[in-house]
């Protein structure tokens, strides 16, 4: 896309669900929509041809009182149909990954732990952070009594208010 076209397309007052349909018609590859934080929008993404959605409140920077992705995840997972649900935000350690999976996520994204590792120690620190995350997931799965991430479901979650 030409920069002027892109600039004109992303103006807040010009974006509409029809743009998702237009992209879908032109793009045969997987199409994932980021920034979804409501079940209604998840349904609209599915209806307009998205293959997946990324639950994200953009780190709370843009709307600091928006619901957190893990808090709304069960409602969105119930509406996902064939779409993949990816969680971005609030994932810091292995237990967060497993929690997201139990609540219905297909994938999780992690940024901050690796950003901090890179800032503090470069490639070696990032490799170490990845090792820690893998070890946490492996250990916590063992503590839950499961051998595979596919065994994790909502029965492992108890919400206490």
Short names for language-model regions:
Residues 1-87, 95-116:
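Alpha/beta enzyme core
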Residues 71-161:
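Alpha/beta catalytic cores of nucleotide-metabolism and tRNA/nucleoside-modifying enzymes
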């Amino acid at each position: 896309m030409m920069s002027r076209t892109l600039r004109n397309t992303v103006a807040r007052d010009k974006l509409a669900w029809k743009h998702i349909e237009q992209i879908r018609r032109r793009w045969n590859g997987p199409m994932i929509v980021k920034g979804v934080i409501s079940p209604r929008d998840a349904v609209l993404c599915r209806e307009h041809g998205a293959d997946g959605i990324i639950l994200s409140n953009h780190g709370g920077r843009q709307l600091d009182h928006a619901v957190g992705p893990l808090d709304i995840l069960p409602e969105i997972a119930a509406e996902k149909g064939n779409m993949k649900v990816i969680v971005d935000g609030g994932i810091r350690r292995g237990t967060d990954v497993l929690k997201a999976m139990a609540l219905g996520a297909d994938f999780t994204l992690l940024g901050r732990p690796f950003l901090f590792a890179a800032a503090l120690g470069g490639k070696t620190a990032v490799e170490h952070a990845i090792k820690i995350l893998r070890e946490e997931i492996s250990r916590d799965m063992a503590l839950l009594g499961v051998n595979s991430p596919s065994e994790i479901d909502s029965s492992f979650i108890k919400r206490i208010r």
